[in-house]
């Protein structure tokens, strides 16, 4: 909705197509846009990204620039630029903030934490998780914060987060913090912690969704959110596309990184949007 509004405000027309993560359907949609002779195509690549490469090649041959958001297409695909948030930066921000809060809350002794992974083999999830570990190590120079659990939820859902956190908390009664790969994990994990009377557990994740911010505002377990804002990414992608079509500028790089923002209980009101669809 944000991207459509921005395009229309600039005097353009936005043709929407939703593939629901179906790569074959996205190929058909791109080919339809080419047939309609659109001026540019903005996509969020479906998985597997390699599937849509042939359609992107056709767009290139038709002199239609392709701008990607959220994730880049396959490396060999012909696209102009990808506007993305840095998965490592986002994960690092979460680990860094959780470590700061843990060391302040527990000035002495060993502190235990766990990570809820997503899907084994998912590259972005793995990058986020390892970055969170690095963020913790950078702050915890004495090595007091110990990872005691790393469990895959099997998906990016609240239910997966709830079940995984429940197992994690029961098996590790002294756990002081849980880091999720995404907001859904810690939204579910908060329910698990409250059910087990462990609302003292600190939680953080990447995304910064409206629901997670509301839970933070209510003083529940969530205390750190690295904001992976689709609005910010979409705004940057549309601005870059409009500038390109108006002959004002081309993207400076094939990969345009949108920096993440750390949201905590202290600044959540600055970023919370009650009307957000995300």
Predicted feature descriptions by range:
Residues 1-278:
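A residue-level marker of the well-folded mature domains of exported/periplasmic proteins
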